[in-house]
């Protein structure tokens, strides 16, 4: 049932009127532009009732709209009440949220937004769009949704920060800072201000627990040619963390970042070298940070060099990625064997949450397990068509053994982050379900076996995954692959496989870890997605045109595919060989976990038989 947002919107409009704001924007992100956020920052969800991870809410004095992408069309339609208009991003004749905002601002109206929740680039672009219709954009320092939320708003987390040991990180934080300073020297810049939480955690080899599923902590950082600072609530730091940082990193209160930026900007202004007066700031940093540093005169907005460095995993991180995916594959195999036995042999009634709870319990037994990497998508039948479905405890259906079951799940281990999707059917699938599954599988294999010259982007290879669906007039409304962190965020940039502008600008590089996850969804009927994690690496080719290195992929996910859903007549001989080789690898790498578990071992052996 949708949440009744009438009173919340009425209170928000009262506050807008007091501050002379005609239209108010509520983005999804927090002040660090995080995709996944802490409960205290779920402002868009609070005001609209829509709980998906992506979207922007726009509220005028008489209307309210929610814009989101294809992953969430179904979910948003179910969760929004009658006060809201759903803007389906990317669909024909549907305005973007910026265009819709500009329409509401016609005739000199004022659009307000918390400047900490959008980037400077977004603010500039939006301001230009609004000006075209006669409106204007202003930053509103006090977040109006927070004022509506009042005392019911959850407290900001204060979880402890932990050291991420060199045995898992593979590189000391001192070396990472040295590399960043080389970048500053190369660009002739005074320093870099860092606000992305995963970048700070990676840079200083620290991890936290402030945001569910993401081992990060609220902080800012500043690195100059001679100093390194960490702005964090010091009560969260253990003695081990303080000893780890030693005298190489100065600790500052989290709240003091804006005052420090003003002082830093003033100090840089006295530097005689004009180039060294500017600071690097990620193009994902907030408008408020940009303004505090002095705006365009003092800031060079760049794609973060830390994001680029973090995305190329070192040898230790790659070995950890391989190892944790074997353990995680064993956990998923045990879960699927258990689930089939319960549903088919024991006739147990299990709902979607009962099942995902069991999976979490199985995972927790494995070495170096810390927690889940996102909320498990455990979906039966029509719910599998909701791309980012979330089963509600106490209000979700029982798993139907005669329908498709889609499970998208992952875990955080000290040595890596996992993300795997498998679609299964424990009964007799329809011909369309088998066809869809097999076309999706062909797409997964096409990415897995792709070879391309260095410098190729994920945008360029996205069609490899879709080609088999396209030939049948089918498609899916999400990207094909995203970067994956190393005991960090399960969604990581800057590279990925899809049609995002960012993916068109970022070549896939040896050492990148990405998902390979094509899908197909029929609303109200079923959904198919298969996801493996792959590591980009240099590969040998018979020839070397242009004397360039060539890039291919190594899959690290070790979980059986669903033979019951395959229409093998649609697979080529090469594709059948790939499936058989993959299943042989899964069997060899995971069978040792089940020497004392006959049920799972037998299931694994059956599921990895040649096709």
From Swiss-Prot:
<dbReference type="InterPro" id="IPR033740">
    <property type="entry name" value="Pept_M24B"/>
</dbReference>
<dbReference type="InterPro" id="IPR036005">
    <property type="entry name" value="Creatinase/aminopeptidase-like"/>
</dbReference>
<dbReference type="GO" id="GO:0005737">
    <property type="term" value="C:cytoplasm"/>
</dbReference>
<dbReference type="InterPro" id="IPR050422">
    <property type="entry name" value="X-Pro_aminopeptidase_P"/>
</dbReference>
<dbReference type="GO" id="GO:0046872">
    <property type="term" value="F:metal ion binding"/>
</dbReference>
<feature type="binding site">
    <location>
        <position position="419"/>
    </location>
    <ligand>
        <name>Mn(2+) 2</name>
    </ligand>
</feature>
<dbReference type="Pfam" id="PF16189">
    <property type="entry name" value="Creatinase_N_2"/>
</dbReference>
<dbReference type="InterPro" id="IPR001131">
    <property type="entry name" value="Peptidase_M24B_aminopep-P_CS"/>
</dbReference>
<dbReference type="InterPro" id="IPR000587">
    <property type="entry name" value="Creatinase_N"/>
</dbReference>
<keyword id="KW-0479">Metal-binding</keyword>
<comment type="similarity">
    <text>Belongs to the peptidase M24B family.</text>
</comment>
<feature type="binding site">
    <location>
        <position position="408"/>
    </location>
    <ligand>
        <name>Mn(2+) 2</name>
    </ligand>
</feature>
<dbReference type="InterPro" id="IPR000994">
    <property type="entry name" value="Pept_M24"/>
</dbReference>
<feature type="binding site">
    <location>
        <position position="531"/>
    </location>
    <ligand>
        <name>Mn(2+) 1</name>
    </ligand>
</feature>
<dbReference type="GO" id="GO:0070006">
    <property type="term" value="F:metalloaminopeptidase activity"/>
</dbReference>
<keyword id="KW-0482">Metalloprotease</keyword>
<keyword id="KW-0378">Hydrolase</keyword>
<dbReference type="GO" id="GO:0006508">
    <property type="term" value="P:proteolysis"/>
</dbReference>
<protein>
    <recommendedName>
        <fullName>Probable Xaa-Pro aminopeptidase P</fullName>
        <ecNumber>3.4.11.9</ecNumber>
    </recommendedName>
</protein>
<feature type="binding site">
    <location>
        <position position="517"/>
    </location>
    <ligand>
        <name>Mn(2+) 1</name>
    </ligand>
</feature>
<feature type="binding site">
    <location>
        <position position="531"/>
    </location>
    <ligand>
        <name>Mn(2+) 2</name>
    </ligand>
</feature>
<dbReference type="InterPro" id="IPR032416">
    <property type="entry name" value="Peptidase_M24_C"/>
</dbReference>
<dbReference type="Pfam" id="PF16188">
    <property type="entry name" value="Peptidase_M24_C"/>
</dbReference>
<dbReference type="InterPro" id="IPR029149">
    <property type="entry name" value="Creatin/AminoP/Spt16_N"/>
</dbReference>
<feature type="binding site">
    <location>
        <position position="419"/>
    </location>
    <ligand>
        <name>Mn(2+) 1</name>
    </ligand>
</feature>
<comment type="function">
    <text>Catalyzes the removal of a penultimate prolyl residue from the N-termini of peptides.</text>
</comment>
<keyword id="KW-0645">Protease</keyword>
<keyword id="KW-0464">Manganese</keyword>
<dbReference type="Pfam" id="PF00557">
    <property type="entry name" value="Peptidase_M24"/>
</dbReference>
<keyword id="KW-0031">Aminopeptidase</keyword>
<dbReference type="Pfam" id="PF01321">
    <property type="entry name" value="Creatinase_N"/>
</dbReference>
